[in-house]
């Protein structure tokens, strides 16, 4: 399917978010790390699980580091590009140029705003009572070059592991299914949706206020952004990327913004390879990402076209 006209979408999005806000049933929780855990005032649409009676899931088995006692995790690990998207605690952009080569200097992880540590496992942080290493041969979080082995085996190819969405209280990952909730819609997303729609509808002050409300969450406490126009939208894009990280939004956001073919073509992902305290900036997999413009519309299945002579394929897919 293709997308509706922008103006109608913006009005619909604004009105829908406004109606939710007016219910006064939802709010931001103080601790960002609790925002996606469900059973709180931020969760709007939540799917619950039970490890014993079911339904349950295996998210932890897919993403935990090897030191959790399970050898088949870390199927996806955060990239250096994602890490560099985080501002410092004062809301400023961090200069990572020194780590775009080889250095023994410790990265500025402790300077980054609170949502970073709540989202990503990095060298020196604590995970399930262990200080993480994330290095070549590391005991707690080992590094592995891309395709060094046939499977991930719980090792990182970027120097990082995912923390967000995992159950830190789950000790027996190998023998126990996961039961943490999946929050499909939470109030922070509603505020950001409304902010974006307000921006499109030239409600600049309201857009700023809504985004700054998310940034000002009690446990995050980032200063507000006063930018406007295209500069505000760029700030908004990054704010949405950080706040909703790994919740399944960014790819679809880039599609609806019609920016994927610009930023996701010939795009490569990087990481930090850590060897005996030396940090080396690396190309994670040596592959260019591709996003041809025809991916903005989904093709009509060939079987449907064969079954109905009146159906035509989209021009992009002919």
Predicted features and spans:
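Single conserved hydrophobic/aromatic residue that forms the stacking wall/gate
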Residues: 1-5
């Amino acid at each position: 399917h293709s997308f509706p006209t922008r103006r109608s979408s913006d009005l619909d999005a604004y009105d829908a978010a406004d109606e939710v806000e007016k219910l006064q049933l939802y709010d931001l929780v103080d601790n960002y790390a609790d925002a996606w855990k469900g059973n709180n005032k931020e969760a709007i649409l939540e799917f619950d699980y039970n490890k014993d009676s079911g339904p349950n899931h295996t998210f932890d088995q897919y993403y935990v580091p090897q030191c959790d006692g399970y050898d088949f995790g870390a199927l996806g690990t955060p990239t250096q590009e994602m890490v560099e998207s985080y501002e410092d605690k004062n809301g400023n952009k961090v200069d990572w140029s020194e780590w775009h080569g080889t250095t023994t200097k410790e990265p500025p992880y402790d300077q980054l705003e609170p949502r970073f540590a709540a989202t990503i496992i990095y060298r020196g942080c604590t995970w399930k009572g262990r200080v993480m290493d994330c290095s070549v041969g590391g005991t707690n979080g080992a590094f592995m070059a891309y395709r060094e082995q046939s499977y991930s085996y719980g090792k990182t190819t970027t120097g990082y592991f995912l923390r967000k969405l995992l159950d830190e209280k789950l000790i027996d990952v190998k023998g126990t299914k996961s039961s943490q909730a999946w929050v499909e819609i939470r109030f922070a997303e509603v505020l950001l949706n409304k902010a974006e729609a307000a921006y499109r509808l030239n409600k600049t002050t309201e857009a700023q206020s809504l985004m700054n409300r998310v940034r000002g969450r009690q446990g995050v406490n980032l200063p507000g952004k006063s930018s406007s126009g295209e500069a505000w939208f760029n700030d908004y894009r990054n704010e949405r990327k950080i706040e909703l990280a790994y919740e399944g939004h960014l790819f679809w956001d880039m599609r609806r913004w019609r920016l994927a073919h610009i930023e996701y073509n010939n795009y490569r992902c990087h990481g930090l390879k850590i060897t005996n305290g030396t940090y080396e900036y690396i190309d994670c997999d040596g592959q260019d990402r591709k996003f041809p413009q025809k991916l903005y519309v989904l093709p009509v299945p060939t079987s449907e076209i064969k079954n109905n002579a009146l159906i035509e394929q989209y021009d992009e897919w002919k």
